[in-house]
Amino acid sequence: MKLNKIEIKNFKCFENESIILHPKLNILMGNNGTGKTSLLEAFRILIGSLYLAFDKYKEKIEMPGIVKDDIRLKTVSKSLEPQIPTNVSANAVVDEVFLPTPEQPYQLFDNNEITWLRSMETFGGKTTTRDAKEMFAVSKKIQEAVRNGDEVNIPLVAYFSTDRYKKERRDTDISKAGSRMRGYFNALDTTTNTKFFLDLYYTETLDEIQNNVAS
């Protein structure tokens, strides 16, 4: 899956912004306070929509949403007022194996493209998912493929916030026979979980040695 374009409205410091992405590599450059981290947080919400239909494992696979601190503030008559709705939307190319089937009740774009939008329409309200039906269908396809044991490549997701180096998340519960979806545990969390990674690596390596099968 590759993101082609994102659009954000009333998100953090951005009133209305549209960004076209390079298919290979994208680098954000700018002075402090120009919105680089804000853009990454918008990406985090959009990519998190991939989790819409995933099985939830003790809140380790969490779908981030728009929060009150994400809403752009504007000076109006000498006061700061939140500007809503706050929207983040994206267009992406999806591997054909994960595309929704033709009988789905919505229209796919051409060239294996999907689009989705997340929004906060009232201050402090919930982040909407009604305009993310295409991504929900892709998410469902991925979960079904994993559940059925299909040999398919699924998207790699990793988010590294500027706070990860100083915030350590403490939880365990890594089992040898865990789901393949463990690879998504805490992937979009703003904290670091070194122990989780080491435990996961240990159990997968041990299983590979003992059973002589690729992990």
Residue ranges and their predicted role:
Residues 207-215:
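A short, highly charged nucleic-acid-interacting micro-segment common to nuclease
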Residues 1-202, 214:
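P-loop NTPase switch/coupling surface
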